[in-house]
């Protein structure tokens, strides 16, 4: 299943419209290229509807919000829905400020998202209006562990049912779920948290995967999360004592570039609940 998801990305090379944050925009573009898709980074309200029309999927990331891009996100999201394009929302830091929270909620009302990806604190904030967001990282009280895994899976499935979206909760244990089925994913490496933007890259990667596999959004999102985690493992094995987080970031992108469906199929670590 995972092999097919990745192979479809390489075969179809979908064009993905990214309205993302300026901290990680270059990394997101390179991640989309590395997986075999193509990126466009456009965020002016005068062109986003037109750009979305020529694309096949949309990735919206609220990491560096401003009044100009908020309007652009709504326009692009509405156009994506009109065209039947998959849309991914990355609600970076929702709950940390009133602007982020209100914008994320407005986007959820205005746009039908295929996938919503965030850490557990961000997803909790969207789902119940509360959470313990501190910046863009999940508070220790909100971490997914083996002990609370079943409880979190049930919560994520409920939120998926309410939104109609696949929900991807990423952390030490990743959960990707729709209302009925959840993938609990164990790929990744702790050093990935030392890089700014691995989550942003994953959302861009997810947009490419779900766009190339529109009939299987749950499996496509799970494949993207597995691929990113596996890339983190492969990249870490390459590091020398002189290397740091900048080298690690590049190695993760390289790992996706060289990865194929067979490697993903054999390297993925997950269980289904």
Where in this protein do the model-derived segments appear?
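Short pre-catalytic strand/loop immediately N-terminal to key active-site residues, enriched for Gly-Thr
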Residues: 186-196
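Active-site cofactor/substrate anionic-group-binding motifs, chiefly glycine-
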Residues: 31, 35-84, 89
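Glycine/small-residue-rich loop that forms an oxyanion/phosphate-binding "nest" at active or ligand-binding sites
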Residues: 69-118
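Buried hydrophobic packing segments
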Residues: 28-31, 203-210, 221-224, 252, ...
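Conserved post-catalytic alpha-helical subdomain immediately downstream of the catalytic base
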Residues: 196, 206-248
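Conserved phosphate/ATP/ADP-binding segment of small-molecule kinases
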Residues: 100-182
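Glycine-rich phosphate/adenosyl-contacting loop at the front of the ribokinase-like
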Residues: 1-41
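Charged C-terminal helix
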Residues: 230-273
């Amino acid at each position: 299943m995972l092999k097919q998801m990745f192979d479809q990305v390489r075969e179809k090379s979908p064009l993905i419209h990214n309205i993302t944050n300026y901290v990680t925009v270059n990394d997101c573009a390179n991640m989309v290229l590395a997986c075999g898709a193509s990126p466009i980074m456009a965020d002016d309200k005068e062109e986003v509807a037109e750009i979305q029309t020529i694309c096949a999927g949309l990735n919206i990331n609220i990491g560096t919000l401003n009044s100009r891009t908020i309007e652009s996100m709504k326009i692009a999201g509405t156009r994506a829905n009109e065209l039947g394009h998959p849309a991914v929302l990355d609600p970076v830091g929702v709950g940390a400020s009133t602007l982020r929270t209100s914008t994320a909620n407005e986007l959820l009302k205005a746009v039908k998202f295929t996938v919503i990806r965030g850490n557990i604190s961000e997803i909790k904030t969207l789902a119940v209006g509360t959470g313990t967001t501190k910046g863009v990282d999940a508070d220790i009280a909100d971490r997914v562990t083996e002990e609370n895994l079943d409880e979190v899976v049930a919560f994520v499935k409920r939120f998926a049912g309410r939104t109609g979206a696949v929900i991807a909760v990423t952390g030490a244990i990743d959960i990707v779920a729709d209302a009925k089925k959840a993938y609990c994913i164990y790929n990744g490496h702790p050093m990935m948290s030392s890089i700014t933007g691995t989550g942003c890259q994953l959302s861009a990667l997810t947009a490419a995967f779900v766009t190339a596999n529109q009939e299987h959004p749950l499996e496509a999102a799970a494949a993207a999360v597995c691929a990113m985690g596996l890339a983190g493992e492969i990249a870490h094995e390459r590091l020398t004592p002189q290397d740091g987080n900048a080298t690690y970031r590049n190695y993760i992108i390289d790992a996706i570039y060289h990865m194929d469906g067979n490697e993903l199929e054999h390297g993925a670590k997950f269980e289904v609940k």
